[in-house]
Amino acid sequence: MHVEFRFNVTYSVDQLITEGENTKTVHSAYIVSVYVDSTGNMVLIKNPTITSIPKKSDYKPKAIESEGTVDSITTNEINEFLTTFFKLYPTATASELSYYVNDGILKPIGKEYIFQELVNPIYNRKDNQVTVSLTVEYIDQQTKATQVSQFDLVLEKNGSNWKIIE
């Protein structure tokens, strides 16, 4: 399947401008067009163009809740699997990821992040699969900043091993 996308991305920039003794803040907004090919590679196809600053939407995403369909033994297994995986993930190669993840689901990131914790994992069983919605907290070794990433995954157990399949 050959899928391609084009996205328009609006972003804003705050600049602190100093001229002699005077300092002022200038707030500007721009829009760019980004082309994404079927493998996830991206390229800007339109230079940043001035635009108005969009208003915040009233949209409120529906909170995902546990349906109580995953027992405590399975929850502990998945917690252990995900903790192991997310400790390895930042520095793992594609070959190493293949033991934990179906091809291309999560790509190597090549960063020196130190795993901190799984935050609010929510597990729900659907047939022989478990859907997972969670946040993962890392410390970036270069900046010492906390890196927080959200993941929505589908796990499946083959034999005694869990694997991320979506």
Residue positions per predicted region:
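Weak global preference for isoleucine
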Residues: I17, I31, I45, I50-I53, ...
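Short beta-strand edge/turn micro-motifs at domain boundaries
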Residues: G20-E67, Q150-E166
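Hydrophobic, Leu/Ile/Phe/Ala-enriched alpha-helical segments that form helix-helix packing faces
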Residues: V13, V34-V36, F86-Y89, L155
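Detector for Asparagine
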Residues: N8, N22, N41, N47, ...
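Generic structural signal for short, solvent-exposed loop/turn connectors between secondary structure elements
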Residues: S95, D103-K107, K126-V130, S160, ...
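Surface-exposed, charged secondary-structure patches
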Residues: M1-G20, E112-D152
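Core segments of small alpha/beta cavity-forming domains
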Residues: M1, P54-G110
